[in-house]
């Protein structure tokens, strides 16, 4: 019984760090990659030129201002 519990504990400890680490698909896109997609944020009505970020509707305008 103890050996089965030890095997189960070892498997859980080996799998846990793999699920905690962010995968490549979870990483946010960097700004140079966004600039190559021809996104005109300066012409967006939600772009704040003083803060150099978008104040609202960040799914339409990039980069988003922190709240």
Swiss-Prot record:
Signal peptide span: 1-22
Prodomain residues: 23-50
InterPro entries (alphabetical): 4Fe4S_Fe-S-bd, Conotoxin
Organism expressing this protein natively: Conus tessulatus (Tessellate cone)
Keywords: Cleavage on pair of basic residues, Disulfide bond, Hydroxylation, Neurotoxin, Secreted, Signal, Toxin
Pfam families assigned: Conotoxin
Domain of life: Eukaryota
Note on domains (UniProt): The cysteine framework is III (CC-C-C-CC). Classified in the M-2 branch, since 2 residues stand between the fourth and the fifth cysteine residues.
Family recorded in the similarity comment: Belongs to the conotoxin M superfamily.
Protein name per UniProt: Conotoxin TsMMSK-011
Compartments reported by the entry: Secreted
Tissue-wise expression: Expressed by the venom duct.
Residues bearing PTM 4-hydroxyproline: 63
One Gene Ontology cellular component annotation held by this UniProt entry: extracellular region
GO molecular function: ion channel inhibitor activity; toxin activity
Disulfide bridges in this chain: 53-65, 54-61, 58-64
């Amino acid at each position: 019984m103890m050996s089965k519990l030890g095997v189960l504990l070892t498997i859980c400890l080996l799998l846990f760090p793999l699920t905690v680490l962010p995968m490549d698909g979870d990483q946010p896109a960097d700004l140079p990659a966004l600039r190559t997609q021809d996104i005109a944020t300066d012409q967006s009505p939600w772009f704040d030129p003083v803060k150099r970020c978008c104040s609202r509707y960040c799914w339409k305008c990039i980069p988003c201002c922190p709240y």
